Amino acid sequence: MQRRGALFGMPGGSGGRKMAAGDIGELLVPHMPTIRVPRSGDRVYKNECAFSYDSPNSEGGLYVCMNTFLAFGREHVERHFRKTGQSVYMHLKRHVREKVRGASGGALPKRRNSKIFLDLDTDDDLNSDDYEYEDEAKLVIFPDHYEIALPNIEELPALVTIACDAVLSSKSPYRKQDPDTWENELPVSKYANNLTQLDNGVRIPPSGWKCARCDLRENLWLNLTDGSVLCGKWFFDSSGGNGHALEHYRDMGYPLAVKLGTITPDGADVYSFQEEEPVLDPHLAKHLAHFGIDMLHMHGTENGLQDNDIKLRVSEWEVIQESGTKLKPMYGPGYTGLKNLGNSCYLSSVMQAIFSIPEFQRAYVGNLPRIFDYSPLDPTQDFNTQMTKLGHGLLSGQYSKPPVKSELIEQVMKEEHKPQQNGISPRMFKAFVSKSHPEFSSNRQQDAQEFFLHLVNLVERNRIGSENPSDVFRFLVEERIQCCQTRKVRYTERVDYLMQLPVAMEAATNKDELIAYELTRREAEANRRPLPELVRAKIPFSACLQAFSEPENVDDFWSSALQAKSAGVKTSRFASFPEYLVVQIKKFTFGLDWVPKKFDVSIDMPDLLDINHLRARGLQPGEEELPDISPPIVIPDDSKDRLMNQLIDPSDIDESSVMQLAEMGFPLEACRKAVYFTGNMGAEVAFNWIIVHMEEPDFAEPLTMPGYGGAASAGASVFGASGLDNQPPEEIVAIITSMGFQRNQAIQALRATNNNLERALDWIFSHPEFEEDSDFVIEMENNANANIISEAKPEGPRVKDGSGTYELFAFISHMGTSTMSGHYICHIKKEGRWVIYNDHKVCASERPPKDLGYMYFYRRIPS
């Protein structure tokens, strides 16, 4: 039976008031225009508050606005009422109780509310055999908190009844988003339901596979009809092979094959030769069991790697997660975990580290009232609001309370159970920060380092006034390139947010052990014997730091002194030191087969780090600078005709490509220019533009484009005229110089063609003999300076320079063979002790594996 108790007390107010039957219709009349029935495109948030992690399971329940369908906890619903004037909310409450035990001790079947069933997608485990729940819904009218119990068909207007039913039966907005997160959804094979499988006694071993017709041990496919193991071919697998699986299909006609090494409890890569495309096999577990493969106990070995590669890393998982030790759970402010949404541990680890930094705490949680009060009408789509919500959830301690013995006894006596919070769910945060990114918006595992840069980019773009907490990571890198032939040098600076440290494998201190282990491992694999105990390479941190500072060769370096390509050498130094230094260990690389591989190494990362010796010194006495001349770009004739068509409206720039480039560490404005000047042809093409132009002085300056007017008359410029007769507008000059031509070329070409961009380009291509006329250039520059008001010099990059001495306070570790798989956890030093954050589990760390980390966070030691 539905519980009809009074509404929990509102903030600073009394409990709810119940209405007499005759008053309900009259009370709702003034609010009817604001009550809506959810349409198909509306998102109904009835699982989680927009400002907090309150849910229907929370003590105060959840309030769903009957106009916007946003949800608010008890502490935040008044804010929404004051801001919007919306008065009618649906209050949802789920009561969880311990099940009544039968005479034999078994739990009785779960009871549900006979009138109300909320289709809630909460993260609490309410399907346990020990608990049952009862759902309650009512309409609440603000500001007097009048309550109308639901359902109430007899007394409510028809529109209100329809709206309430639609809200109660609506699906979670995150479920609606799920289909969009998967690209290229595969069709179900028409052969899967009635697939013939031969009873030939074939049993497939868990490892040691080999093509039945050649010696290949990778890219192997198991035919699901006869159990043949044969190699694939590049056109449907993209990793090479001799095509024996396809030949077998042509000979026998058996249509389906599964790629060995991709089988997991969640599925596998299945290909249909008959349908000529990857497909889904809904009966895959049954088809694999026919050949002795237990799909539920298989672990994927990505891209054809052997299962032994996974077994070798068992010790890595155990060490990083501190398995085998009894870890003490931590509760309270700063000790709240994040639930895993399915491959979301990369996000959880980064956010735990981010919100352990005081500058981020102050910028978001410290400004919580202001950010929440001035949030847009839909706070679920506001970055600063969702950052503040997440930060408060992690730091407040509100969702990390230890169980109290007296409360447990009282709950047992009342047969009621209040679920202990096992962390908060970052669903709303992840949905927003990943929606514009093709990778992070998927449900696949991602690289924590890439997400860190993605987050920094979002912080930069959504800065709160003059406050930008990501400034603590920003530093300047000085790159010195020397032409080996002329010995002349060029110094440039760029902005970066993390230090990428190479793994100096050649400096391993246990080389003899590694060689012996590798020989033993190969012999064991060949003879199918148990693998030897893992021997991990031990790399001195000093060797990695030395590898970072050593000069590197620059292939195809264009020397402006020679006006030709030459050998070059590049060295990198810190032009400034950040307040917080993030160090990424470059553990991941690609093998000869382009398969991602991970260096399984142990590096003695220091607790105290001094990199003052890496401070940049700039141009040294006796050094001669390379001339400031850009390399020419050769554009084929057929490209000239398309050049003008590639220029797009700046408002149509592909922001996803811009963000992908920005996450590589390039300035945001440079990324926008790269995407613009390559005609929205994708991040890869834009990246090539960046490589060519990154040394130009205006590389990071904002993209400024002239407006396009109506059709120009013959011989007239398509751009607006400048204040000086026939003086080329700076915007047009910038377009041409961004294509690699010299400034004086651009100016003379535009003057010769009356500032017509297309004709100016043709003029440049038809005058290859053009040489710089210094008198002409000087005269023109003087005229330009006399007639054009120069803008103020743009503010330089914001950096917080200081000493290069640091102490370690957090690190993120990765377990697995690739950034696209495995698991991430985070260790943070708080209150003088290390704490392990493993998704929703937060415990005191006994043996923090500082030598196995992937990303390290250092804070500056005040000098």
Curated annotation (Swiss-Prot):
What is the reaction catalyzed?
Thiol-dependent hydrolysis of ester, thioester, amide, peptide and isopeptide bonds formed by the C-terminal Gly of ubiquitin (a 76-residue protein attached to proteins as an intracellular targeting signal)
Active site, renumbered: C345 (nucleophile), H823 (proton acceptor)
Paired cysteines (S-S): none
Where does each UBP-type zinc finger lie? 187-295
**UniProt effect for mutating K233A:** Does not abolish ability to stabilize SIAH2
Instruction: Report, as the record phrases it, the tissue specificity of this protein.
Output: Highly expressed in ovary and testes.
| PROSITE patterns linked to this entry | UBA, USP_1, USP_2, USP_3, ZF_UBP
Q: What are the alphabetically sorted keywords of the record?
A: Autophagy, Cytoplasm, Hydrolase, Isopeptide bond, Metal-binding, Phosphoprotein, Protease, Repeat, Thiol protease, Ubl conjugation, Ubl conjugation pathway, Zinc, Zinc-finger
Q: What residues does Zn(2+) bind to?
A: C211, C214, C231, H244
Q: What does this protein do?
A: Deubiquitinase that mediates deubiquitination of target proteins such as BECN1, MITF, SKP2 and USP10 and is involved in various processes such as autophagy, endoplasmic reticulum-associated degradation (ERAD), cell cycle progression or DNA damage response. Component of a regulatory loop that controls autophagy and p53/TP53 levels: mediates deubiquitination of BECN1, a key regulator of autophagy, leading to stabilize the PIK3C3/VPS34-containing complexes. Alternatively, forms with NEDD4 a deubiquitination complex, which subsequently stabilizes VPS34 to promote autophagy.
Q: What is this protein called?
A: Ubiquitin carboxyl-terminal hydrolase 13
Q: Can you name the source organism?
A: Homo sapiens (Human)
